[in-house]
């Protein structure tokens, strides 16, 4: 929410952030690895910039991107020391340009009549002034980083570029044990949740009141998004409605889901749960979950598989090559 914050950078970065890095003349990078999800096409990343890279790991310096000023140091110590040398300068013209980019392509999602991810994030922002949000891996991870307002008291934990599906629930368990009394919300997809759902037993045993949100679109959503945008809608092994006889006719009404009933499964572990299908039921569901002081609580949200993550940089593209919608 800081006025100078302009959003995520990279493959699912905000338009303004990607344009700012592409057009800047000086780039301070603190603790990043410059992985491919951040840079896009390497030789066109920040083409006009002198790059200052602060990292405590010597091996990360100039590994992917050549940097002009390498600084091997603890980030906090380096920033504190550098702040002593900062002088005021006029950035009005540059900030005006950034504001133009922000207004040109603000982050947005389609408004769904029943419910969409943005409705859920709006409730989280409104209802939880203090919380720890832990995400799994997939579309919900990117959407959370885009639409949940991160503040001093509302923190976000994710596994970054490691791609560790199944991280959400055990990550939330660790966060709750380390921060008793603080609301901990894990956000997972129906695919990632099933990779470590057995850890509900641990959460019940340790009496951890985690709120576990499942964005259930009956798909491995991020992979499906790639198949839709870049592989001619040839959906393979991503639809969790598909059986052995499926011939890829996505949307067949008679095709049954191959995911469990998450609410009954939660109850079988001794946890609690509720299924939400309408936006007016989101806020009451979170209020009910907050009443559970010693028991994990699952909220399953039924999500449209066409709720995709935008913007998106084309594979092999530059930060300028953003798909804004399709």
Language model features: what each stretch is:
Residues 30-31, 74, 137, 302:
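Glycine-rich, N-terminal phosphate-binding loop of Rossmann-like dinucleotide-binding domains
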Residues 10-60:
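Phosphate/diphosphate-binding loops
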